[in-house]
């Protein structure tokens, strides 16, 4: 199975700061998908097919990458972006998730 390693595990950003988190796959995958989860809620699909934003996701979010290296970027951190972000692949069975990047707001 394909192992997804997310970095950093925990990070914080000030309002307006650019944020980048990465997801590294142990083998090449065709696409990467990202989910956002806030405490006490179910994960929401956030970015799919590497770079497509799910409905309602602000344009300050973007996704990029290929093969074994992928990233999620927020151009300008906002308070509501504080959450845990998970990458996921389903190019190869079984479907696998990364362990998550927890993003906190620095005030």
UniProtKB/Swiss-Prot annotation:
GO cellular component: immunoglobulin complex
Region (Framework-4): 97-106
Region of interest (Complementarity-determining-2), ranges: 49-55
Region feature Framework-2, mapped onto this chain: 34-48
RNA-binding listed as a keyword: no
Keywords assigned: Adaptive immunity, Disulfide bond, Hybridoma, Immunity, Immunoglobulin
SUPFAM superfamilies the record matches: Immunoglobulin
Annotated spans, Complementarity-determining-3: 88-96
Keyword Ribonucleoprotein listed: no
Gene Ontology biological process: adaptive immune response; immune response
Protein role: Anti-2-phenyl oxazolone (PHOX) Antibody.
Protein name per Swiss-Prot or TrEMBL: Ig kappa chain V-VI region NQ2-48.2.2
Organism: Mus musculus (Mouse)
